[in-house]
Amino acid sequence: MSENPVKRPGKDGSRNKFKPVQEEGGTPGWFRSKGESPQGKFPGFLLFLMAGLLMLFVFLRFFSGTDAPEITYNEYKSVLSRALVTEVTVKTYEDKSAILSGKLNAPAQLQLIDKTTLQTNRFAVRVPSFTLEQADMLTEKGVRLKVEKGSSDLNTFLALFAPWIIFAALYFFLFRRMSGQNGAQAKNIFSFGKSRAKMVSEFEVKTTFKDVAGVDEAIEELQETVEFLTNPEKFQKIGGKIPKGVLLLGPPGTGKTLLAKAIAGEAKVPFFSISGADFVEMFVGVGAARVRDLFEQAKKNAPCIIFIDEIDAVGRSRGAGLGGGHDEREQTLNQLLVEMDGFTTNENVILIAATNRPDVLDSALLRPGRFDRQITIDKPDIRGREAILKIHTRNTPLDGDVDITVLAKSSPGFSGADLANLVNEAALLAARHEQVLITAVNFEQARDKILMGPERRSMFISDEQKKLTAYHEAGHVLVSIHTKGSDPIHKVTIIPRGRSLGLTAYLPLEDRYTHNREYLLAMITYALGGRVAEELVFQECSTGAANDIEKATDIARRMVRQWGMSESLGPINYGDSHKEVFLGKDYSHIREYSEETALQIDVEVRNIIMGCMENAKTVLSEQLAVLHRLAGILIEKESLNAREIQEITGPGQGALPNPVTA
């Protein structure tokens, strides 16, 4: 958490400094007063250490050894020779030293170890060792002798004060640290109620709206939101009110979090960032407490922005999913609803949230007054992809054969994250080959790696298996070329990539937002082309078509159940029984049609798949010679691009192979 002062507009329009948010746990450091530097914790520790040393000194001075006056060894021999000693108690230690404590038959003037004299009948003397000869000498002189096992001063000290030392250590090093007194955001029972939001200053984030592309409408909406905070008078003059919240919706990788970073870089106000998962813990009430603490910090630093990433972790619809609602999550959501638009209003505090699961969010969270604006961020179109690629390649050296426009055309369906990964993979490939510039070949190899997976050339495949794979992929290629409405082929390979032994890659010429019946049937037909080719050539089929069959069945079932493309069943939605319950708002999926209708659905799905399979058989039977030639060349070269495929197969009813390169 930074304590850098961030400037924000004052009432007079000047730029003043706002107070940095106090770190978690209150006063940072041990014995630190308000305003003291972080180094203030060290004097507290030294004070504790000095107190311990003082206790040790007092013990050694007043409680160690014996309370009798200590005399010199020569004085001890003198009183012993004069037969003044009546009894002696010997305490022996592990280092063989001993302390002799004795009594005299009458008070005598004795010389102490500090060279002074004292009239006393008691004494003590330290000797390096106590032997049997010394014991016999004392016994012969009629001295009563008693021998005890003594303990060292340190052991005695620890025995007396160890419990207190341990307690003090626990207090300073455990409890105070766990309560956050050292300034750290400790994740423990004493700081559970504290918000874990990180405050970001304008000096920390370098990302701005100039670093974001392909989402022009979203940028426009968010720029207006930022302007609400920096120049509210412009909107207040005509009665406009600042929006309470902005919800960013869209699939993963489209730039929702990047937009939040850009807001932090553009807004000259405090910016609090937190994940939705950081609210809920194992203890009840923690989530609601953290929401309260977050908004309290935000109010102290208003105007400001709060960003909650993956808000579906805490904003899920109440009472949804298996087992009913989660009480702790519901309490957290209720507190969030109150803070956003409850009895008390939060002026000049805007909440921005991001999610890729808007379908599971609670309806109370989505209403106007809380999230006033819902901005959808979808995958970019060709112009958006071109703008994104220009941003990601502005610091990379490109060869003259790289055309960004062509590269954008050859990457339909790519999200912003996919495009960033594409540029990075191309740069890594160029660096691997000691290149100075990134070429079009590098981009093509990187795109193939993303679409088809990395090559596994080290994997050993027998000639028989390679031949089977070649005919399977050749079947896909020929059926696709001779089926109307199909996607153009980009590349075919029998080099193992990812988890597959071979692959046929398709690359549409344009972005598709809707699919007609002809296109869907073409997808099913060329998906089954590999299975049909195996049956025609080898008179048997293999497990290699398992994924193709799964995809074909899924498309056919959706055509009948969801998209109303069955002539006998009509345009009726029969639901999707394959969707997991916990991903939606329903407790369970109820089949809303009869057994007879279910049977009709199965029959329609089977008819669609079998019809497409017959079409694939017809194509391959007519093109059997081309199939053998294509498979043979594929076995020899292992990979064929679009131009090579077109030279072998010639034109067909479907789309021509797509020869586009970067």
From Swiss-Prot:
UniProt region (Disordered), positions on chain: 1-35
Broadest EC class assigned to this enzyme: hydrolase
A Pfam family hit: AAA_lid_3
Cellular localization per UniProt: Cell inner membrane
SUPFAM superfamilies: FtsH protease domain-like, P-loop containing nucleoside triphosphate hydrolases
Gene Ontology molecular function: any one: ATP binding
Cofactor remark: Binds 1 zinc ion per subunit.
Segments on the Cytoplasmic side according to the record's topology features: 1-39, 176-662
Top-level lineage group: Bacteria
GO cellular component: plasma membrane
Topology of the protein relative to the lipid bilayer: Multi-pass membrane protein
Biased composition (Basic and acidic residues): 1-15
Cofactor(s) listed in the protein's UniProt record: Zn(2+)
Keyword hit for Repressor: no
UniProt-listed Gene3D superfamilies: 1.10.8.60, P-loop containing nucleotide triphosphate hydrolases, Peptidase M41
Catalytic site: E473
Record keywords: ATP-binding, Cell inner membrane, Cell membrane, Hydrolase, Membrane, Metal-binding, Metalloprotease, Nucleotide-binding, Protease, Transmembrane, Transmembrane helix, Zinc
Transmembrane feature ranges: 40-60, 155-175
Subunit description: Homohexamer.
HAMAP family listed in its UniProt record: FtsH
Family assignment from sequence similarity: In the central section; belongs to the AAA ATPase family. In the C-terminal section; belongs to the peptidase M41 family.
Protein name listed in UniProt: ATP-dependent zinc metalloprotease FtsH
Species annotation: Pelodictyon phaeoclathratiforme (strain DSM 5477 / BU-1)
